[in-house]
C-alpha cells in the first residue's frame, strides 16, 4: 500500500504516477520511509516510464537514484516475455566503484519486495526453509554488479554465463570488457534502457572513448537517461551519446530571496572561513568544536591522495581523540576503500572521513552533518558536489571552505557568479600564535620520530602545490602569493622541498629546524638499513671522486657563463611550456576553448569588481554595501 502523502502534495503521491506503479513498488517505497516523491522523482519517473529520453539535472541528494531504478524495473517486468538467456535488457553506468555499488544495493533493497526477483537474488541457504519456486516464464529482474579491482573480467563473464542477468550496474571500463565478449548480447529485440549516472563526469575526457565504444555495441532504438547534479555543464556533449529528442528535467531550489537560482539543497548552509596560513590545520579543530551539536559524521576534502596519506597521520595529533579519522582515496586498493567507507558509514561515534574528490560525487553517505574543504577544488564545478555530501534528503547540513587571506577571498565572489553563494562561517573563531606553535611542535615531534613520515610530508606538500598551481581560477589562486614559511610550519615540515616554484625563494628553507640529516632514521629496519648503505656508498671513493670532479668543473666555470647557462635553461623551459600550452589548446574543441575564455573573463571581472570595492572601503564609502542582507544562522543538525 502506498504511503499517505501530507495534505497538499497529491501531485507527488506515489499512487498518483501515470503510468501507475506496481503494488510491490508502492510497498517498497513505503517501507523505505518515502511518504511522497521528491520533485525530481515526480518529474522524471512518469517521463522515463512513458518511453521518453530524459536529461535530469537536480541538486545533490534529491532522490535521483530511484528516479531511474523504478522505471527500469517496471519496464523489465512489463515485457511480454522474459529476456532471452545471456541477453541484457538494461544497463546503468556509474563513474566510480563506490557509486556503482551503492546503486546496486539500493536496487537489491527495491527488488526484495518483488518475490520472483528476490528468489533469484537471495535464494534461501537453509534447507529446512521451503523455497518459493516460480515458473521459468515468470518475469524477473536479475542484476549483476561489475566492478574493476574486486573481481577479474573472467570471473565477471563466468558469473554472467551462470546467472544470465538482464540488468547490469557497472563502471565504464569493466562494462566494456564484458560487452566485448561474444557471449554477451544486447540486440534491439532485448535491450530497453541505458542510464548514465553522474553523466557530466562520465563524459569527461577520461571516459569519452570508453563510453563511445560501449554505445556502439548498443542498439540505437533504446531509451536513454542522463542524471546528474550539473548536467548543464555537459549539454554540448549529450548529442554524441545518442539521445532522441530528450525531455530535460531541471529541478532547482529557492534561495532566501525566493529566486530559483541555487544549485544546492535549501537545508544545506554553505560557508567560508578565512584562515591565516599558519593556522591551516588547527582551524579544523576550532570548526569541529564550534558547531553545536557536535557533528557525528564529517567529511574533510583534501586535494591529493598523497595529502590524504600524510594528513591522516598528523591530524589526530592536532584534533585529539574526540573524533575517529578514516582515510579514503582513489589509490587505495579496492578492498581498503570498501572497508574504510563501511567503517565511516557504520560508525556510532563521531567520525571524520578524510578523502579526495573520489567521495565528492554520487555517494549517498547517510547523515553527513559537516563538510570541510581544506583546499578549494581545482575544478570549480566540483565545489558544489563536495558541499552536497551534507544536507541530503532534507537533512540540515553545514559546509565550510577554508581560504587564505588576500586574493583567495575573491573566490567568494567567483562562487556567487556561478550561482553557488557562500556566507561567512557563522561562529566566531579566534586564533593564537601559541596554538599554532603547539600544533607545529606536536607534528614535528612525530615526524622526527620516523623519517618515513618526513618523506610522506615532502611528497604531500609537492603534490598539494601542483594541484594548487593547476586551479582553473588561476588569477585567484596564485602560487606567487603563497606564504612558504607559514605553510611549511603548518604542515609540520622539517624543511621546504626542492621545487621549481621555490627557485627565487630567499627565506629560510630549513624552517628554523637544525637537524643532522645523516643521523635521521627510519623506524622500519629494512629502510633504515638501506639508508645507511647508501650513506656509506656516498662517503666512499666513488662518491668522493665524483664530488671532486664536480668541484673542479665548478671552479673552472666562469660566473658569467653559469649565469648565461641558467638563463638559457630558463628560456628553454619557457619555450617548452608555451609549446605544451599551444598543443593542448589545439587539441581542444571550440566548446572547451569557449569555456576557458568565459572562466578567464569571469575571474577578471570579479578581480576588477573586488579591487573597486576595496578602494571604496578604504575611502570609507561602502558602509552600507551589505545592508539589507539577511544572515541565516546555523541552527544545528537534525
UniProtKB/Swiss-Prot annotation:
Pfam families on file: CTE_SPB4 (PF13959), CTT_SPB4 (PF23681), DEAD (PF00270), Helicase_C (PF00271)
Catalytic activity: ATP + H2O = ADP + phosphate + H(+)
BP terms from Gene Ontology: assembly of large subunit precursor of preribosome; maturation of LSU-rRNA
Start and end residues of each Helicase C-terminal domain: 283-437
Biased composition (Basic and acidic residues): 534-554, 577-615
Keywords: ATP-binding, Coiled coil, Helicase, Hydrolase, Nucleotide-binding, Nucleus, Ribosome biogenesis, RNA-binding, rRNA processing
Binding sites annotated in the UniProt record for ATP: 58-65
Coiled coil region boundaries: 566-619
Motif (DEAD box): 197-200
The keyword ATP-binding appears for this protein: yes
Span list, region Disordered: 534-638
Record-linked Gene3D superfamilies: P-loop containing nucleotide triphosphate hydrolases (3.40.50.300)
Helicase ATP-binding domain span: 45-249
Residues spanned by motif Q motif: 14-42
Entry remark concerning the domains of this protein: The Q motif is unique to and characteristic of the DEAD box family of RNA helicases and controls ATP binding and hydrolysis.
Quaternary structure, from the entry: Component of pre-60S ribosomal complexes.
Designated name of the protein: ATP-dependent rRNA helicase spb4
Originating species: Aspergillus oryzae (strain ATCC 42149 / RIB 40)
Name of the gene: spb4
Amino acid at each position: 500500500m502506498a504511503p499517505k502523502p501530507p495534505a497538499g502534495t497529491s501531485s507527488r503521491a506515489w499512487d498518483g504516477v501515470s503510468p501507475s506503479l506496481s503494488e510491490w513498488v508502492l510497498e517498497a517505497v513505503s517501507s523505505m520511509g518515502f511518504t511522497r516523491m521528491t520533485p525530481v522523482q515526480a518529474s522524471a519517473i512518469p517521463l522515463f516510464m512513458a518511453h521518453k529520453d530524459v536529461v535530469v539535472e537536480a541538486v545533490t541528494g534529491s532522490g535521483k537514484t530511484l528516479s531511474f531504478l523504478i522505471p527500469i524495473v517496471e519496464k523489465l517486468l512489463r515485457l511480454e516475455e522474459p529476456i532471452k538467456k545471456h541477453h541484457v535488457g538494461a544497463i546503468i553506468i556509474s563513474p566510480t566503484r563506490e557509486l556503482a555499488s551503492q546503486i546496486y544495493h539500493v536496487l537489491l533493497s527495491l527488488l526484495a519486495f518483488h518475490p520472483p526477483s528476490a528468489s533469484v537474488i537471495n535464494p534461501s541457504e537453509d534447507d529446512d526453509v521451503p523455497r518459493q519456486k516460480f515458473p521459468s516464464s515468470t518475469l524477473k529482474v536479475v542484476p549483476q554488479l561489475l566492478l574493476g579491482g574486486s573481481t577479474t573480467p573472467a570471473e565477471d563473464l563466468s558469473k554472467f554465463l551462470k546467472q544470465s542477468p538482464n540488468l547490469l550496474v557497472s563502471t565504464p571500463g569493466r562494462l566494456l570488457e564484458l560487452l566485448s565478449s561474444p557471449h554477451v548480447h544486447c540486440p534491439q529485440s532485448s535491450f530497453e534502457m541505458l542510464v548514465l549516472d553522474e553523466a557530466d563526469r562520465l563524459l569527461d575526457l577520461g571516459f569519452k572513448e570508453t563510453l563511445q565504444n560501449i554505445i556502439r555495441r548498443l542498439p540505437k532504438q533504446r531509451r536513454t537517461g542522463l542524471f546528474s547534479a550539473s548536467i548543464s555543464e555537459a549539454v554540448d556533449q549529450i548529442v554524441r551519446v545518442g539521445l532522441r529528442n530528450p525531455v530535460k528535467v531541471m529541478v532547482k531550489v529557492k534561495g532566501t530571496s525566493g529566486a530559483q537560482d541555487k544549485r544546492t539543497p535549501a537545508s544545506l548552509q554553505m560557508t567560508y572561513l578565512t584562515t591565516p596560513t599558519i593556522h591551516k590545520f588547527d582551524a579544523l579543530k576550532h570548526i569541529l568544536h564550534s558547531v553545536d551539536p557536535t557533528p557525528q559524521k564529517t567529511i574533510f576534502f583534501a586535494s591529493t591522495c598523497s595529502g590524504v596519506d600524510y594528513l591522516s597521520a598528523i591530524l589526530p595529533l592536532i584534533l585529539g581523540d574526540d573524533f575517529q579519522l578514516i582515510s579514503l582515496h582513489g589509490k587505495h586498493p579496492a578492498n581498503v576503500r570498501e572497508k574504510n567507507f563501511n567503517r565511516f558509514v557504520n560508525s556510532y561515534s563521531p567520525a571524520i572521513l578524510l578523502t579526495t574528490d573520489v567521495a565528492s560525487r554520487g555517494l549517498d553517505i547517510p547523515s553527513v552533518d559537516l563538510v570541510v574543504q581544506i583546499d578549494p577544488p581545482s575544478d570549480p564545478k566540483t565545489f558544489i558536489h563536495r558541499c552536497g555530501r551534507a544536507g541530503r534528503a532534507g537533512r540540515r547540513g553545514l559546509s565550510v571552505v577554508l581560504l587564505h587571506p588576500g586574493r583567495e577571498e575573491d573566490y567568494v565572489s567567483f562562487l556567487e557568479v556561478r550561482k553557488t553563494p557562500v556566507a561567512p562561517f557563522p561562529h566566531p573563531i579566534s586564533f593564537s600564535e601559541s596554538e599554532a606553535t603547539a600544533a607545529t611542535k606536536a607534528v614535528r615531534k612525530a615526524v622526527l620520530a620516523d623519517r618515513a613520515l618526513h618523506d610522506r610530508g615532502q611528497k604531500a606538500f609537492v603534490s598539494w602545490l601542483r594541484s594548487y598551481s593547476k586551479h582553473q581560477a588561476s588569477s585567484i589562486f596564485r602560487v606567487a602569493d603563497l606564504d612558504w614559511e607559514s605553510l611549511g610550519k603548518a604542515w609540520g615540515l622539517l624543511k621546504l622541498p626542492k621545487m621549481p616554484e621555490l627557485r627565487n625563494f630567499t627565506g629560510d628553507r630549513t624552517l628554523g629546524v637544525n637537524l643532522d640529516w645523516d643521523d635521521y632514521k627510519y623506524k622500519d629496519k629494512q629502510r633504515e638499513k638501506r639508508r645507511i648503505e647508501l650513506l656509506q656508498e656516498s662517503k666512499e671513493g666513488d662518491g668522493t671522486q665524483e664530488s671532486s670532479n664536480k668541484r673542479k668543473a665548478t671552479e673552472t666555470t666562469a660566473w658569467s657563463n653559469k649565469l648565461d647557462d641558467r638563463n638559457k635553461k630558463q628560456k628553454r623551459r619557457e619555450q617548452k611550456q608555451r609549446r605544451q600550452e599551444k598543443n593542448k589548446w589545439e587539441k581542444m574543441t571550440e566548446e572547451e576553448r569557449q569555456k576557458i575564455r568565459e572562466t578567464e573573463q569571469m575571474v577578471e571581472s570579479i578581480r576588477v569588481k573586488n579591487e573597486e570595492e576595496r578602494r571604496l572601503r578604504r575611502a570609507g564609502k561602502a558602509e552600507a554595501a551589505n545592508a539589507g542582507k539577511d544572515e541565516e544562522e546555523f541552527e544545528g543538525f537534525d
